[in-house]
Amino acid sequence: MARQRADRFDEFLPLLDKLLTQDSTTEKGEYYSAVEARNIPGCVQQPRAPFYVAATGPRGLKLAAEFGQGWVSYGDPRGPADVPVDQAPAVIEAQLGRLRSACEAGGRDYAALNRVLLQGSTAEQPLQSLDAFVDYAGTYQALGIDEIVIHWPVPDSIFANDLAVFEQIAAEGLAQLG
C-alpha cells in the first residue's frame, strides 16, 4: 500500500507540473492520464502556481526538491504519539538533512525551498502558553523550519486549545522570534 502511494505520487507530481506549465498536456501513465488537457487561461504566476510537497520518504523528498516551492513536514510518519517529546526535534532535523541531500543530489538550492512544519504532527504542546509556543517555534526555527502552521482552536477535538492563548501567540509570539 505504501509503495503504491509513493508510485502514485511519483507519477502525479510531474504530471501536475506539466499540466500547470504547458498549454496542452497528453500523458499516459499507470495511474493518471491526460489527453490534450488544456490549461486555459493558464497560470498567472510563471512558470506556474507554486505548490508545496508534503513528504518524508526518500522518493517524496526527491520530488519536493525537484518540483516544490516548499516542503511540508507532518512529523514522524509513525505519528506524534510514537515519538517522545524530547525526540521530536531530532526527527525533524533528520528529515531536513535528507531534504538537503535530495536538493544537493538534484542540483536544487536548499535555501530556496521553503520549509514548513504542521503543528500537531509532533507531541509537543506549543499552544499551552505563549512561552511554550516561543520555545517550540524557536527550536524549529533554529533547525531550519521557515514556517509553522498552527491550528485554530476547535473545542472537543484534537485541536482543542485556549483561544485566548492562540490570540496572544498571534499578537505577541511572532515578534519574539525575530
Where does each model-flagged region fall?
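Active-site-adjacent structural elements that line small-molecule/cofactor binding pockets in enzymes
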Residues: 1-178
